[in-house]
């Protein structure tokens, strides 16, 4: 697949479509500055048709509600989605007419539909209009008409992708679409046709690349402290999951669910990312055997699978393939299986309308691959964009009488109308009460229209008749249990979201409130049935950071079946070390002493390298997760040996031997910090606290580059009058002043490599980037400096701090073996002196005398 061509086209197409759609709006007197008379009958001397007038008024109404830019964006992506859907269908010969809309048989941008127009059998086609366009030689107008008619014709088969035309979206179809340099021309000529052939993944790549500039702009605004709105959350968080990781997640959750109860060597061998169970103790095997007996009773049509953050549907499409293999292994015909999968198995939700459209389309095209008549059967999948109830009003405001023939249904309806206000802010993390939503849907369809007793209720029903069933089905999807929950959730600090999301998460998910990916870990666990499976790819921070310790406690109460610990660069589109990920499969059960299978893939520096290591079976560990609690904070340290676990359980922590403290935050570094050569040297108090009368400048330990034993002493801080000026700074945080000016050991809180510990003489302050250990006994401090700089300590810190963050919390829990071995102190002291001599041999040291070679 030529991703460079796809990316280049998608980014260009978005800007071009927005410009072209805006130009069409301008032709109707509408631009960013205003829209004139909404009820105008003429524009620029031209009389508007009744249809144009209605479309224009509808457009103006939308602009009033959402804003001009948002509406132009929405119309642009609506046409983009339709164009790529039609292109996919024509290349794969899925169009009911079997006549190409954009190209000819050779693949050139010469629409076949124009050449065959006189023989075209297309529902809704007006042959009279066609004849008029041909007679007037208006090829552009003819093609616009044919394109709109084709979209309308697909409405009955694919109503979510091809909504019935006639609204302002039709009015804003760009001009000059037959030109070679149009969006259609570039789509046909720039993306190789083979990229569209039976490769529905192209839909996901187009969606991701289409959002590139919007995503960049969103993060640029975030740096200016502009929160991410619900309209921009999809662009900010959408990330196309690598195909092999999708296969790993689906095969080890959905595939495992089936194989555990229905062993099948052919299926097992065909799923190359499937991991066999780790070797278990006999007692564990007995418990697993009981689970397998339960799984034996499951039938293919009973399996429920959901992706609650489905994006463009990549995971659902592969789940469809695996379900098809399960069905056929159970004796089903492919055609009937495809229909059953749509009706019974697959569910998907997303807050982004355009992503939901594409996911819906991708799943339908996958079903069409197995059933040639699928598009004529009227079957629709359970794939939905979250909808809000804001514009639906509240039935409870009206006299309801015997509406729905049930007070319970009335109360449930009103509950949903309240619960789904601003639902796109929250998406699938919305937690609803368990109620009879299925009964409510049945009652709505059977009795609602006959039980509206008052005029107001009748008018309200007429306005919401078709929207309420969507709301109810949404509630059903959010509350029913699933055998398999599999997703790649959004990665976004909750603090970057709007206040509504922030407040909701703090109230409902206090143990995972730091990031949306963690919230979804917890939420997906709620959606899974007992003994069901949960498969995800998330940032790996939840495995180690103290802010997720309570979440880890919850996760360690269920069985981690296996994990592919990916680390950095698991996504080829993301470079650097910041985004580090892990993919894992959880079974919602708890078997004591169960061992999960863990694949440590953090060393390869490319997406392909990680996949190759996984398939090679390298770096595999079988770990009993109950051991994790032996380490402070219970990190998911699956690679740790029993010997190392015993080191933690048998020795004291660093914080029990010395004070381990974090320092101050000045609140304004440019104002309060300097490098020592920037001030008069004699004005720096480097010794006893009162060596100078009313001193202003003091040495300050601030972390720095990797340097063991001694060094990184080049910063000073304004601490005049005990930091009086700093204390007036609103954003300053003053901590642990009672430990200032003592000799200590410091390290850099953030490090891209290993950690290094340095000895500091008396007389320094320390800040948050240079935390310190302070001991009462000088010999103990020197001994600790040696121990902390040893290789065993680095090995243990790799367990406690596998991210870039060596904060005080995990470092203070280091297990420490104290001995009276004088040799350790002597060697450590020698190393400190050698390191100081080296540091002082450069002019950047305030103790520099002369270069050693002079």
Q: Each predicted region: which residue ranges?
A:
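Non-catalytic, mostly N-terminal accessory regions of nucleic-acid modification and defense proteins
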Residues: 1-265, 364-388
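Flexible, glycine/threonine-enriched loop-and-boundary segments that flank and lead into catalytic domains
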Residues: 59-62, 276, 280-304, 453-486, ...
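Elongated alpha-helical scaffolds
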Residues: 75-87, 358, 739-740, 822, ...
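Terminal accessory regions of large proteins
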Residues: 76, 829, 838-854
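Class I S-adenosyl-L-methionine
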Residues: 156-295, 653-655, 659-688, 697-700, ...
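Conserved hydrophobic/aromatic pocket- or pore-lining residues that grip, position, or stack substrates
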Residues: 206, 249, 311, 485, ...
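SAM-dependent methyltransferase catalytic region
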Residues: 224-563, 589-590, 602-603, 612-613, ...
